C-alpha cells in the first residue's frame, strides 16, 4: 500500500488531498485546505504552509508526494509567491523523506479527465467519480486530489497507455 499526498500550492490557499493505492486501486483518505492569514507577511504565510504540510506528513506518513508545476502568470509577482509556496511545501515533504513528483496542469487533466484542456468542473466531477465521493470537495482540495490521482496513474504506467501525445513520466525529485 502506498499513501500519496497531492498538493495544489498557493500563497493564500494550499489544497491537499490524500489517497491510498493498493493493488492499483485508489481510495480516498482525506482532503482540505491550508489557509493562510490575509493580514500577515509572506514569510509568515510560508511558515503556515510549511507547518500545515509537516502536520499532514506526521499524521498520515505519505511516502510519495505529487505537486503541480508552476505555470506562467501574467503577473510576475503572483508567480513568485506561488513559487515560494510550492518551495516550502516541497521542503516540508522532503524533510520527511518523501519522494516528490511534479506534474503540469495539462498532464493532470489528461490523466484524470482524459483531456488536457479540461475545465475545473470536469476535473472535480472525475475526482468524485474515481474516488466514489458523495460530494465534490472544496476547489483547491479537489485539485490536490486530482494531482494525487494523476501520480497514481503515472506510477502504474498510464503514460505508456496514453502514449507520447498525452503525458510523459516525470522525474523524481529527492
Curated annotation (Swiss-Prot):
Residues annotated as binding Mg(2+) 1: 8, 140
One GO location term (cellular component): cytoplasm
EC number: 3.1.21.10
GO MF terms, alphabetically ordered: crossover junction DNA endonuclease activity; DNA binding; magnesium ion binding
InterPro entries according to UniProt: RNaseH-like_sf, RNaseH_sf, X-over_junc_endoDNase_Mg_BS, X-over_junc_endoDNase_RuvC
Top-level enzyme category: hydrolase
Pfam families with a match to the protein in the record: RuvC (PF02075)
Annotated Gene3D superfamilies: Ribonuclease H-like superfamily/Ribonuclease H
Cofactor section: Mg(2+)
Active site: 8, 68, 140
Note accompanying the cofactor annotation: Binds 2 Mg(2+) ion per subunit.
Binding site residues for Mg(2+) 2: 68
Protein's cellular compartments: Cytoplasm
Alphabetical UniProt keywords: Cytoplasm, DNA damage, DNA recombination, DNA repair, DNA-binding, Endonuclease, Hydrolase, Magnesium, Metal-binding, Nuclease
GO biological process: DNA recombination; DNA repair
Quaternary data: Homodimer which binds Holliday junction (HJ) DNA. The HJ becomes 2-fold symmetrical on binding to RuvC with unstacked arms; it has a different conformation from HJ DNA in complex with RuvA. In the full resolvosome a probable DNA-RuvA(4)-RuvB(12)-RuvC(2) complex forms which resolves the HJ.
Function noted in UniProt: The RuvA-RuvB-RuvC complex processes Holliday junction (HJ) DNA during genetic recombination and DNA repair. Endonuclease that resolves HJ intermediates. Cleaves cruciform DNA by making single-stranded nicks across the HJ at symmetrical positions within the homologous arms, yielding a 5'-phosphate and a 3'-hydroxyl group; requires a central core of homology in the junction. The consensus cleavage sequence is 5'-(A/T)TT(C/G)-3'. Cleavage occurs on the 3'-side of the TT dinucleotide at the point of strand exchange.
Protein name according to UniProt: Crossover junction endodeoxyribonuclease RuvC
Originating species: Legionella pneumophila subsp. pneumophila (strain Philadelphia 1 / ATCC 33152 / DSM 7513)
GN (gene name): ruvC
